């Protein structure tokens, strides 16, 4: 079978790009013909709160060749994307969806392609973690252009059925990532982080966003005894100042270790192998 994947993928970094790279690889392993259609501009720089959108040294990225054609904020590229995918003539188009910002381009492509192939949307989030008033109507607009859906959690299935009651979908658990750095022992991991392996090390890992409750975790660690240490590892979208103020005021401030930066794929095992709980 011939698959087209429309998604951010290498050289973009982050979970969606990593997932799409793995999906591409596994479909090829199964003997399918696959082509990736990528963004030439994902987020305009003025709207992107992080350091960079692209892989850097230390990232164990799945290097997938792709056609970089879709520009999220340039409607002309929506037509170019349709033409590029149609010329490939796929049996199935898989669209990676996680936020409504991309609906205008995605919905246009899905609408134009649904007469030529099956259009399946793989939904990471039907409704964003920080929802806005326009997220639901935009998501519904896209979903109505699709033949079917893939969801990976009960919550996303629930959201999909509320937004599009007639949706045809399958649900499979989110697969494990297998492209990170080599495994090391706990003592070595703790040594690299400058923490003690005998302590009860807790980890907050990933992008730091308001909705994730890091402020509550910082307050909670101050109520635990000195055996508990907290590691905060991830890039902050927004200012870290309010979290730093909580740390400075905490009785546990000497037991809180901050790595406020994007953690490369190569470094990830160090953090996860140093702890008792996530």
Task: Kindly label every feature range from the protein language model.
Residues 9-13, 24-87, 156, 161, ...:
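N-terminal strand-loop element at the rim of the active site
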Residues 40-43, 205, 229-244, 261:
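Glycosyltransferase donor-sugar binding loop
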Residues 144-184:
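Donor nucleotide-sugar binding/catalytic pocket of nucleotide-sugar-dependent glycosyltransferases
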Residues 181-195, 245:
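A short helix/loop element that forms part of the nucleotide-sugar donor recognition site in Leloir-type
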Residues 195-212, 218-221, 231:
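Conserved donor-binding/catalytic core segment of Leloir-type glycosyltransferases
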Residues 69, 241-266:
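Nucleotide-activated donor-binding/catalytic signature segment of Leloir-type glycosyltransferases, i.e.
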Residues 276-278:
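Conserved small/polar residues in nucleotide/adenosyl-binding loops
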Residues 118, 126-145, 158, 184:
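Nucleotide-sugar donor phosphate/pyrophosphate-binding loop at the beta->alpha transition
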